Design a protein with these regions (language model features):
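C-terminal output helix
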Residues: 107-117
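Active-site residues of response regulator receiver
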Residues: 53, 83
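The feature encodes the CheY-like receiver
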Residues: 15, 57, 75, 87, ...
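Conserved acidic carboxylate
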Residues: 9
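Acidic, metal-coordinating helix/loop segments flanking the phosphotransfer/catalytic sites
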Residues: 31-49
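Charged docking surfaces used in two-component/phosphorelay signaling
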Residues: 13-24
Length: 134
């Protein structure tokens, strides 16, 4: 089964570039253009990884990340922030919000895909679990 990646980005050209490269590498790709849609789609498709822009309409990426981390269904999905915000403060804020990794724009599509492949290949400790406590 192909791994599912949710791309949360409001720039249509960048969404197309990222989606094309991920699909070419064998991933299934879903997209969202704002924070509210990102939350809905993350909860409905339960992706294996989320690529999350920070500067989004509605809820920003920091808020989206924090909400996803508080939701048991999405708390363990790796989240990679992909943003033009390159300051140390933004990186720290992103990691404190629960990001797994932080990639700044502009980026190499090959580097982005390689990072996604690495993260989705990691053990299930970062992945959502559906086991019930007995």
């Amino acid at each position: 089964m192909r791994k599912k990646i949710l791309v949360v980005e409001d720039d249509p050209e960048l969404v197309e570039l990222i989606s094309f490269n991920l699909r070419a590498s064998g991933f299934a790709v879903g997209t969202a253009a704002d924070g509210i849609d990102a939350l809905k789609k993350a909860r409905s498709i339960l992706p294996d990884l989320i690529l999350l822009d920070l500067m989004l309409p509605g809820l920003d990426g920091f808020a989206v990340c924090e909400i996803l981390r508080r939701d048991a269904a999405t708390a363990r999905i790796p989240i990679v922030m992909v943003t033009a915000m390159s300051s140390q403060f933004a990186r720290l804020t992103g990691m404190e919000a629960g990001a797994t990794d932080y990639i700044t724009k502009p980026f190499s599509p090959k580097h982005l895909v390689a990072r996604v492949q690495e993260l989705v290949a990691q053990p299930a400790t970062l992945q959502p679990t559906s086991s019930a406590i007995s």
